Amino acid sequence: MEFFQSFCLSLGKYGCYVLCILNVAEQFNGKKFNAAEILALVVSAIRKGYVFFDYQDYSNPDNFFVHNPDKLLSLATGEKWTVEKKEPSYKSVSGDYVIEQWSADGRIKHFARTSNGFNSLQKSNCVSNGKIVGLRVFRRIK
């Protein structure tokens, strides 16, 4: 892959939602992905159009925008999913896989899954000093 280090830097800077969705897949599948599997899934999702990436500008803040979160999760699990945006007050029910959207200032946002201890960043100002401003709730279609 050309500019591999820049790609990884961009994933680290902008890829929190992608990585949270893959964490949902890990929880559902009952196994952790290794780095090569994560990279392969991310590149496949970009090629399929589920995730945006600008190969002409690795610092584009729209990189790793998830157009189709349900399809990304399907790619990683082999199952079909729905996803809904919910308010922070939403109480999850059995079968829900929840991703939290955090913000400390109302502008910068970060996705994490603190309910199961997952945060793609070692330290996140949004999580440390912010609050949950939204949820993404995934459910498997049976």
Regions found by a protein language model. Give the residues of each.
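Flexible propeptides and autoinhibitory/regulatory segments associated with cysteine proteases
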Residues: 1-12, 126-130, 139-142
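Stable alpha-helical structural segments in soluble proteins, enriched in small hydrophobic residues
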Residues: 20-24
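Conserved active-site-adjacent core of cysteine acyl-enzyme catalytic domains
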Residues: 25-141
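Soluble non-cytosolic domains of exported or imported proteins
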Residues: 10-11, 15, 19, 32-33
